[in-house]
C-alpha cells in the first residue's frame, strides 16, 4: 500500500477535506542519515530512500521516496531523484539546508490535491480555482491532462474551452451567478472620483439617491415618481391615438398656416399637451441632473440607460425645432408640398416617443436582464434566424409547387415566404392557407419543423436570461448590503476619499484573512496516507 508520510502544521480549510486525517497514534520515523560513507544510489547529498520534506505555501508535508518514485516525471519526482543540491534548487523556490526542507511558493490547496494524486494516481479538479489557475498549477507540478480523473476531465476541458468567452456565457456554472467583486468595486471607484471634485460630498449623495433606489428613503420616492411620470407619458401617447383625437387631428390638417397658428396648437388636446410638457420637463431634469452629478462625463454617455434617457426627450425638441422651422418658412411662402413633407418628419419624431417605455429598464431588474440577454445572445439569435431562413426557403418552394395552380395567394415563392414564416413560428394567421393535399402536407411539415427548430435556440436564450436575472439580483443585493456599510463610511468621511484609502482597507482585510488561514493549530498531529 502506498504510504505518504506527512508531518507539519495542519492547514484548516476546505481543501483539507481531500485528505482524511490519520489516527492520532500514528507516528512517523525517518531513517537516519549515515555519518560517513556514500549512499548506495551514488547521490552525495541525500539518501535515495530519504523522505522528502516540502513546504508549499505554508503547508508542510513529508513524502515518502517510494510514492514519488511512481511518478518520476513530476516535479517532486525529479526533485527526489536530483543528483545534487544545485540541481534540486532549480526545481524549488528555496531550500533550507538545516531543516532539509524544500519550499514552494504555490497554491496550498492544489498541493493537497496533489498529495491525493500521489496516493491514488488520479487528479481531481478543484472548484475553488479558476480553470486557468488550475491548469497552471498542474503544469508547474508536471501533471498533464491525462492525470485528470475521468469524472473531472470532460468538465475541465469544457470549462477551459468556454472560459475565454465573456463571463456572461458561463451560465452553466452555478457559481457564476454570484456577484463579481470587480463589479462592486466599480461603484466604489466611481464614488472615489468625488474626492477631488467640487462639492464632492453633496454630489455624491445626490448621485447615489438618483442611481440607487435602495440607498435611502428619498431615493425610493424619487424612483416611484420617475416610474409614475414614465407611465403617465405612455398613457398620454396611447390616449392621443383614440378615434376622437384622430378626428380632431384630421380637422387640424385642413387648417392652413394663414391663420397664424401652428398646427400643433390646433391638433393637441390642452390637457394632454400640458401633461406632455410636464413629462418632458421631468425627463429633461433627470437627464441634466444625472449629467451634472455623474462622476465621469465620458462614462455617462457610454451607459445604455443614459442614452435611453436622451432618446426619450430628443423627439420633443426635434419636433419643436421642426415646428419653428415650419412657422418661419410659412412667412417666406413655403409651398404646401414642402409643408406636407415637414409634417411627416414631425410625425416620425412624435412616433419616437414610444422609446420612453425603455426608461422603465432603469427601475426593472427583468428589463435590464432582458437587454443583457439580447446583447450577449447574438450567436443564438443568429442560429435562430439561420434555421428560420432555411426552413422558410425550403417549405415556401414546396408550397409554391403544390399550390401554384390554385388561386389562393401562392403566386410566387417570395409571396410564400410570409406563409412560411407564420407557419414555422406557429402563429398561423390564416390569411393564406393551402388547399391541395400536397400543400397541406407541406404545411404540416413546416409547422413540425418550426416547433423543433425554433425550440432549440429559444431554450438556450431562456436559460441565459434566467442566469442574467439571478446574477443581477445577486449583484443588487451585494451593492445594497455594501451600501449600508461601505457607502455610508464614504459619505460620512471627508472629501479627500481616494483610491489609496480603499486599497489600504482591502489590504488590511486581506491580511486579516491570511492571518486566520495561516495560524497554526495548537497541537498539530502527523497524518498517514
UniProtKB/Swiss-Prot annotation:
Family, per entry: Belongs to the potassium channel family. S (TC 1.A.1.2) subfamily. Kv9.1/KCNS1 sub-subfamily.
Q: Reply yes or no: does the keyword Transmembrane helix apply.
A: yes
**What parts of the protein insert into the bilayer without crossing?**
414-425, 426-433
Q: Which residues cross the membrane?
A: 218-239, 271-293, 305-322, 343-363, 379-400, 441-469
**Which Gene Ontology molecular function entries are recorded, alphabetically?**
delayed rectifier potassium channel activity; potassium channel regulator activity
Q: What is known of its domains?
A: The transmembrane segment S4 functions as a voltage-sensor and is characterized by a series of positively charged amino acids at every third position. Channel opening and closing is effected by a conformation change that affects the position and orientation of the voltage-sensor paddle formed by S3 and S4 within the membrane. A transmembrane electric field that is positive inside would push the positively charged S4 segment outwards, thereby opening the pore, while a field that is negative inside would pull the S4 segment inwards and close the pore.
Question: Compositional bias (Basic and acidic residues) spans?
Answer: 504-516
Q: Which SMART domains match?
A: BTB
Q: Where in the cell is it found?
A: Cell membrane
Residue ranges for the region (Disordered) are 498-529
The UniProt keyword set, sorted, is: Cell membrane, Ion channel, Ion transport, Membrane, Potassium, Potassium channel, Potassium transport, Transmembrane, Transmembrane helix, Transport, Voltage-gated channel
What organism does this protein naturally occur in?
Lemur catta
**Role:** Potassium channel regulatory subunit that modulate the delayed rectifier voltage-gated potassium channel activity of KCNB1 and KCNB2 by altering their kinetics, expression levels, and shifting the half-inactivation potential to more polarized values. While it does not form functional channels on its own, it can form functional heterotetrameric channels with KCNB1 and KCNB2. Each regulatory subunit has unique regulatory properties that can lead to extensive inhibition, significant changes in kinetics, and/or substantial shifts in the voltage dependencies of the inactivation process.
Give the record's GO biological process terms. Answer: action potential; potassium ion transport; protein homooligomerization; regulation of potassium ion transmembrane transport
| Keyword Lyase attached | no
Extracellular side residue ranges read 240-270, 323-342, 401-413, 434-440
Q: Which InterPro entries match?
A: BTB/POZ_dom, Ion_trans_dom, K_chnl_volt-dep_Kv, K_chnl_volt-dep_Kv5/Kv9, SKP1/BTB/POZ_sf, T1-type_BTB, VG_K_chnl, Volt_channel_dom_sf
Supply the name of the protein: Delayed-rectifier potassium channel regulatory subunit KCNS1
Q: Where is this motif: Selectivity filter?
A: 426-431
Task: Tell me where it mainly resides.
Answer: membrane
* GO cellular component annotations of the record: perinuclear region of cytoplasm; plasma membrane; voltage-gated potassium channel complex
Its topology with respect to the membrane?
Multi-pass membrane protein
Which regions of this chain are Cytoplasmic-facing, per the record's topological domains?
A: 1-217, 294-304, 364-378, 470-529
Task: Please give the subunit comment from the record.
Answer: Heterotetramer with KCNB1. Heterotetramer with KCNB2. Does not form homomultimers.
